[in-house]
Amino acid sequence: MYAYNTSKTFVLALLLLLPCSLLTITSAAQDEPEYKMELGGGVGLTNYLGDFNGNLTRDIQPMAGIVAKYKVNPRTAWSAVLNYGTLKGNSRNEKTYYPDYAGAPISFSTKLTDFSIRFEYNFWPFGTGNEYYGAKAITPFIALGAGLAFAKGDETATAFQMPIGFGVKYKLQKRLNLALEWMMHFSGSDRLDGVSDPYGIKSSDLFKNTDCYQGLQLTLTFEFMEKCKTCHNDRE
């Protein structure tokens, strides 16, 4: 009888402690700090796409950059990105015939400085310690933005550019994030290669017959500026 009562008391104690334990675990997850900002840098590859190159894998050059992000909520963020790299091209590699350059093929190398403001959308809520609203340590994302491109070679060109692309983010640690992204930058200029309108056909459209460039970049960012723990609206 004594053993039965002891067992009954033990079971009742477990039943009472279990909800308390679950509440403690949930509270700990909810109290996990979240951060508003990210700051970091990245390295990658870029190449020019225009009149003298239509190949995504030709004349690939290195690039590097810095990035700052403001996280609106686990699904969305705004980022400011500054990149520096090189664009190269050569008309000898193109099948298109350019009468003005048939006897003197064009070869160029320009230093590219690129700045843009982007909006990022994560397909899954991104983070750790917040599983109660579905946060994931890895997520694919898409990005769209606007900015400026500065190309300096034999000539200097400044152009409006619109980056659009996608990537994947992975949380290495609670405050350390790794991202791999591919972006296509559509510029409003045909002079990033130093030559304007080699076809001799003028265009009035913003992105028609203009130069573009792409970038594949790996970035590492650190989170800082802790969010107010009583602000829950941005988690929806």
Regions from the PLM with identified roles:
Residues 74-156, 219-222:
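Gram-negative (and chloroplast) outer-membrane scaffold detector with strong preference
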Residues 57-60, 95-101, 195-202:
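Flexible, surface-exposed loop regions and adjacent strand-edge segments
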Residues 1-34, 223-236:
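Cleavable N-terminal export/targeting peptides
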Residues 112, 173-236:
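Predominantly the C-terminal beta-signal and adjacent terminal strand-loop region
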Residues 41-45, 66-70, 117-121, 144-148, ...:
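Residues on the lipid-exposed face of transmembrane beta-strands in outer-membrane beta-barrel proteins
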Residues 28-69, 217, 221-227:
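Short glycine/proline- and aromatic-enriched beta-strand/turn motifs that initiate or cap beta-hairpins
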Residues 35, 58-62, 111-115, 136-138, ...:
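Residues that define the transmembrane beta-barrel architecture of outer-membrane proteins
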Residues 33, 70-74, 123-125, 170-174, ...:
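Outer-membrane beta-barrel strand-turn architecture
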